[in-house]
Amino acid sequence: MNISLLLVGPTDDPLLNQLIEGYVKRLNHYIKFDLQPLPALKNTKNLSPEQQSQKEGEMILRALDPSDRVILLDEKGKQMSSLGFSEFIQKQLNAGGKKLVFIVGGPYGFSPEVRKRAMSSISLSAMTFSHQMVRLFVVEQCYRAFTILKGEPYHHQ
């Protein structure tokens, strides 16, 4: 199985990009992991939040394969500990399939169609984070999950 992080829009901060790439490199020691950036929508000033979410949703759905196991990163999703997340990852790996796709949406969340396509959604925290920061947190938590699964000393309880 491969894991992808599907992103709406670029990661603007070069320091965040450097950190994200560092964790992606580490993750590839355990599993094929890649970032799948989608272009940011242009000319959104005349779009309502719902219209913007809809257009982003269409772009997201076009980027997915029918066999992809889709997990949304969403403030309304299920919260879990790092240990719980590692167990979640293990269950996904055990379920098989070619690719597990985590999706970080745009500023107005996910369209109803994207929500229907997803198997589940995860919330990283009750706090609100920028979409830029969420990218780093997800990649780090994926790395942490694999070190937990392999019994390596990165995670401390």
State what each model feature region is.
Residues 15-17, 81-83, 111-114, 133:
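Short glycine-/acidic-enriched loop or helix-start segments at secondary-structure transitions
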Residues 1-27:
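N-terminal beta1-alpha1 ligand-phosphate binding loop
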Residues 6, 34-36:
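General small-molecule cofactor/ligand-binding pocket signal
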Residues 5, 71, 105, 138:
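Conserved RecA-like P-loop NTPase ATPase core
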Residues 112-156:
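Structured adenosyl-cofactor binding patch, chiefly the S-adenosyl-L-methionine
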Residues 11, 75-78, 106-108:
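Short glycine-rich anion-binding loops that position phosphate/pyrophosphate groups of nucleotides
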Residues 2, 97-102:
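Loop/turn-to-beta-strand initiation segments
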Residues 32, 39-98:
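S-adenosyl-L-methionine/SAH cofactor-binding core of RNA-modifying enzymes
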